[in-house]
Amino acid sequence: MSIAPPPLSVLLELTHRCPLACPYCSNPIALAALREEMDTAGWRSLLQQAADMGVLQAHFSGGEPMLRKDLPELVAHARALGLYSNLITSGVAGGEPMLDQLQAAGLEHVQLSVQDVDAAGADRIAGYRNSLSKKREFAAAVRARGLPLTINAVLHRHNAERVPGMIALALEWQAERIEVAHTQYDGWGLRNRAALMPSREQLLATIDAVETARRQLGDRLAIDFVTPDYYARQPKPCMGGWGQRFVNISPRGDVLPCHAAETIDGLRFDNLRERSLADIWNNGEAFVRFRGTAWMPEVCQGCPKREIDWGGCRCQALALSGDAATLDPVCERSPIHAQVRATAEQESASPAPAFIYRRPERPAAATADPLE
């Protein structure tokens, strides 16, 4: 039996149910049904086990976590255990009564997704009418209760030029932080890659917009920025390193090293109904397989950054090369690095295909705009 340092944070994907249908959603293509979701007792046990291990943060996510009526109870339990609680939400479900309950339960932070600053563009991405106005109302309710607010803005070819507007929106809504993140191509994002991929010119413009805003705003607004991997020369560390800082719990209670890990065939993902969190974290096949550096191919073993990027993303390696155990193909040392860049350039230069919206039914078929 091995003992690994405990994760810093646990992400509780309480449900895959969501009012929105964003085509870049990181949830898996095979969404969990309501009947498959872990019950309240299961989530409470998970929080207790996490606290016992030394985990510091509990992030309540989904889907849309505010669709779970037991969310206030779970937040209160996290608070009682000394876990920092963060809500990751679309802001269009639950409303002020639920927010009051969450505040009373001890919720400490809210992350609110924003699809676009253009109302029509926001509705088109979300597949949900009047989404921006509802998010504005929710943000105002969050700030009226004195809760810290972070705006999560996901970028792609259809909204990349509106980064300055997104930053202005964060200021208007009195957010303390904004995360401006290009789409990461896993889950539904991978399925919609050709519809979402920005051009290199768009990427450079977003970099310039963020750097300009940082200079102008100083400490008035914290701005986090995540670039798209496909134009990179070096990979990003997956969740701070596979099985090192982060653990993800699916609605079914499966324990995952990252939210996309289930795409890797051949790995066994243990469930909390059958095994303890600590045992899974320390000894579970899925966590041990790519933890550390022993698994790395020779080209990674000799790299001075091997304990910085940890070989990059295993799910992306599988998606682009067919082998989860090879180096991330966005790395310039990869034999298919140029092919990855060429794919991005070709897709971004081609007409964008229709979105495949995130829906539990008929996930493999291209769908019409749900707003039409």
From Swiss-Prot:
Catalytic activity entry: [PQQ precursor protein] + S-adenosyl-L-methionine = E-Y cross-linked-[PQQ precursor protein] + 5'-deoxyadenosine + L-methionine + H(+)
Enzyme Commission number(s) of this protein: 1.21.98.4
GO MF assignments: 4 iron, 4 sulfur cluster binding; cyclase activity; iron ion binding; oxidoreductase activity; S-adenosyl-L-methionine binding
InterPro entries: 4Fe4S-binding_SPASM_dom (IPR023885), Aldolase_TIM (IPR013785), PQQ_synth_PqqE_bac (IPR011843), PqqE-like (IPR017200), Radical_SAM_PqqE_MftC-like (IPR050377), rSAM (IPR007197)
Binding positions ([4Fe-4S] cluster): 18, 22, 25
Keyword field: 4Fe-4S, Iron, Iron-sulfur, Metal-binding, Oxidoreductase, PQQ biosynthesis, S-adenosyl-L-methionine
Cofactor binding: number and manner: Binds 1 [4Fe-4S] cluster. The cluster is coordinated with 3 cysteines and an exchangeable S-adenosyl-L-methionine.
Domain (Radical SAM core): residue spans on this chain: 4-220
Cofactor: [4Fe-4S] cluster
Pathway: Cofactor biosynthesis; pyrroloquinoline quinone biosynthesis
Any GO BP annotation: pyrroloquinoline quinone biosynthetic process
Classification via Pfam families: Radical_SAM (PF04055), SPASM (PF13186)
Top-tier EC class: oxidoreductase
Region (Disordered): 342-372
Role: Catalyzes the cross-linking of a glutamate residue and a tyrosine residue in the PqqA protein as part of the biosynthesis of pyrroloquinoline quinone (PQQ).
Subunit structure: Interacts with PqqD. The interaction is necessary for activity of PqqE.
Family label: Belongs to the radical SAM superfamily. PqqE family.
Protein's UniProt name: PqqA peptide cyclase
Organism name: Xanthomonas euvesicatoria pv. vesicatoria (strain 85-10)
Upper taxonomic lineage: Bacteria, Pseudomonadati, Pseudomonadota, Gammaproteobacteria, Lysobacterales
